[in-house]
Every structure is written in C-alpha cells, then in structure tokens.
C-alpha cells in the first residue's frame, strides 16, 4: 500500500535533520539499505562453525562462552584469536584471571608477539581498557577471561567478610549498555568467558546452574555457547585429551540449539583432524572397515589416532576432505549430527 505523499515529505525532512545531527545513515529505510551478509570469525572447529550457521562467531557482536572448569572455554577462545589473526585481524586478551599460558597459546597458533594483553587489577579497570581499545576502531576481536574475575574495586578495597551484593552485576550491566553500540559500529567482536555457579536454594524444575555477572550478559550476547567435557580420550592407556560438546544455546544470527563435538588434545587444542574423520565417516566420504580408515584408494591408518596423525602431516589431503564435507553438508543445510558412538573407546 502506497504511503501518503505528505507523510513521505515529512519523513524525508526528518531523516535529513537526523543525518545532520547524528551523521549519515543514523536512520534509513530498510528497503533502501542493502542487506549485507554477516561476517564471521572461524572458531577453529569445523563442527562448531557449521553449528553456528554462518561459519563462525559473528563480527561486531557480543559472544559468551561458558561451562564448568577445564571444559575448553579458554582453548576455544584462543583458537578464535588464532583464526582472526590468520586473516590479518588485531586481537586483545584481557586476562582478568592472570592465568594466560603464553606457551600454550603459541601452540594453538596464536601470534603472541602481536597479541595485545592486559592483566587488570579491578573489574572497572578491565572494562575501561575494553571500552578504550574498542572505540579506537583498530581492534577486531577482544576476549575477556573471565566475567567471574571482574572484581569491583569496592570489593577489593573492602575487608574479607564484607558483603557486596549485586556490585558485579551492576558493573556488567553498565558496561554492556555503553559498549554494545560501539562494537557494532567498529565491527569488533567481544568474547566473554564465563563460569558456572549453582543456584542457592534451587528446588523444583529448571536447571540448578547459572552463570556469573548477573543477567545483562545473557540479554546482550548475540551468541551463547555452552561447552562441556563429555569423555576422556585415551591411547595405550595414556590420557591424551578430552572429548568436548559445544551447544549453541542462543543464536541471533542463525537457528540456535545446534551442537558440535570435537577432541581437545593436551598441548595441542582442538583436533581439526578428528573432526574431519568424524564427519567424513558420517557422510560416507571416509570409509571405515573394522579399525581401518581410508579415503578413496588411500589408507589413512588403523585406528582414529593414527588416521589423525596422517592428516596432520598431509595438510593438502585434510583440506581436500574438509572441502568435500562442506560441499556435502551445504551452507544452508542443518548441521549433520556426529556419530552416536565414538570411533575409538572413550571414557
């Protein structure tokens, strides 16, 4: 239905006035603005990139990665930093926990020489640094590790037994209100690593778990990823890593509630080769006959770990199988579930 001509003129005049005050593009007709594809940063995990629906975490948005201790939260975040740096991105790591392992980060592919790192003393200091570097327009990705460690100054300056109810939640709410628009304008991705706590006095229905820092982050985050350790990986009775499951519990840029499973190897991080084998077998791209795995006429190895070792050495072959997996799944298809049973014994 056509809009009245007088209304059109009034709206056009209002848009011109708004452009003068707030800059061009402050108010636009959606039909006049070309809808752009959402850019993404790979997570370093083939399965999680597919589960997120756009090939990774969206740029210019807030992401929350949470889970129990030693579930792979920081490992996943460091992989995202490494992928961002591979494409020329500038990254920062706000280490509120003062626990960044630089050697491990380097093993995961992070360019530690060019990684900006801050170890703030208080939550206010951390969030001020975050706002300043974001407003600079020169940063592509910021990781905050973790929300639980963003301790308000009043709590640090107070005595050990003092009660400071809701201080951290108010601090987070205030910071997120200020920074959300800036992140979008500067196309900067912000990742908050968060921990799980048990709700006090929880009875009846609903999950007894909650995340720290209040409710603001739950609302402002465009993507929330719940990552859990689900099994131990063993080879010759030696514990060599963990199997992790990541669930996209909130997604504003694609359908939510998709899941991905992957191996996190000690000292190496996410095993891309393990995912290639899992998805390859599921899609009949990689053949499994007994313990032997093969691709076309080439034997990959006897057992999953041997096949992973071969793919790690032969990058061209790994890339070829990865491409076939992506073509088979298709960019608009639902994520293919992983095998119901692992290819090798886990506990």
From Swiss-Prot:
Family: Belongs to the RecA family.
Family matches, as CDD domains: RecA
Function text: Can catalyze the hydrolysis of ATP in the presence of single-stranded DNA, the ATP-dependent uptake of single-stranded DNA by duplex DNA, and the ATP-dependent hybridization of homologous single-stranded DNAs. It interacts with LexA causing its activation and leading to its autocatalytic cleavage.
GO molecular function: ATP binding; ATP hydrolysis activity; ATP-dependent DNA damage sensor activity; damaged DNA binding; single-stranded DNA binding
Location within or outside the cell: Cytoplasm
Key word DNA repair present: yes
Keywords carried by this UniProt record: ATP-binding, Cytoplasm, DNA damage, DNA recombination, DNA repair, DNA-binding, Nucleotide-binding, SOS response
Database matches in NCBIfam families: tigrfam_recA
GO cellular component entries: cytosol
Predominant subcellular localization, coarse grouping: cytoplasm
A Pfam family matched in the record: RecA
One GO biological process term: DNA recombination
Entry-linked InterPro entries: AAA+_ATPase, DNA_recomb/repair_RecA, DNA_recomb/repair_RecA_CS, P-loop_NTPase, RecA-like_C, RecA-like_N, RecA_ATP-bd, RecA_C_sf
PROSITE patterns in the cross-refs: RECA_1, RECA_2, RECA_3
Amino acids binding ATP: 67-74
Keyword check for Magnesium: no
Biological classification of the source: Bacteria, Pseudomonadati, Campylobacterota, Epsilonproteobacteria, Campylobacterales
Protein's recorded name: Protein RecA
Alphabetical list of HAMAP family matching this protein: RecA
């Amino acid at each position: 239905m056509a809009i009245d001509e007088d209304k059109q003129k009034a709206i056009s005049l209002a848009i011109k006035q708004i452009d003068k005050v707030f800059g061009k593009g402050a108010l636009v007709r959606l039909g006049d603005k070309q809808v752009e594809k959402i850019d993404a940063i790979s997570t370093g995990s083939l399965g999680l990139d597919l589960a997120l629906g756009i090939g990774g975490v969206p740029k210019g948005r807030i992401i929350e990665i949470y889970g129990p201790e030693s579930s792979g939260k920081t490992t996943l975040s460091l992989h995202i930093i490494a992928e961002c740096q591979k494409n020329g991105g500038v990254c920062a790591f706000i280490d509120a926990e003062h626990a960044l392992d630089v050697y491990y980060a380097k093993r995961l592919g992070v360019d530690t020489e060019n990684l900006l790192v801050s170890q703030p003393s208080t939550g206010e200091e951390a969030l001020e640094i975050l706002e300043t570097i974001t407003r600079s327009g020169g940063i592509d990705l910021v990781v905050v590790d973790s929300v639980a460690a963003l301790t308000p100054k009043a709590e640090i300056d107070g005595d050990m037994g003092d009660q400071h109810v809701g201080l951290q939640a108010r601090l987070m709410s205030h910071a997120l209100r200020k920074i959300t628009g800036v992140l979008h304008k500067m196309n900067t991705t912000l990742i908050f690593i968060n921990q799980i706590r048990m709700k006090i006095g929880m009875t009846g229905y609903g999950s007894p778990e909650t995340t720290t820092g209040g409710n603001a982050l739950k609302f402002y985050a465009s993507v929330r990823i719940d990552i859990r350790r689900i099994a131990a990986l063993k080879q010759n009775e030696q514990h060599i890593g963990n199997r992790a499951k990541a669930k996209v519990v909130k997604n504003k840029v694609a359908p939510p509630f998709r899941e991905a499973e992957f191996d996190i190897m000690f000292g190496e991080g996410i095993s891309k080769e393990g995912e290639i084998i899992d998805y390859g077998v599921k899609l009949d791209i990689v053949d499994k006959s007994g313990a032997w795995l093969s691709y076309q006429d080439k034997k990959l190895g006897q057992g999953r770990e041997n096949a992973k070792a071969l793919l790690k050495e032969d990058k061209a072959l790994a890339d070829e199988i990865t491409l076939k997996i992506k073509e088979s799944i298709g960019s608009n298809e639902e994520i293919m579930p992983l095998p119901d049973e692992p290819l090798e014994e886990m506990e």
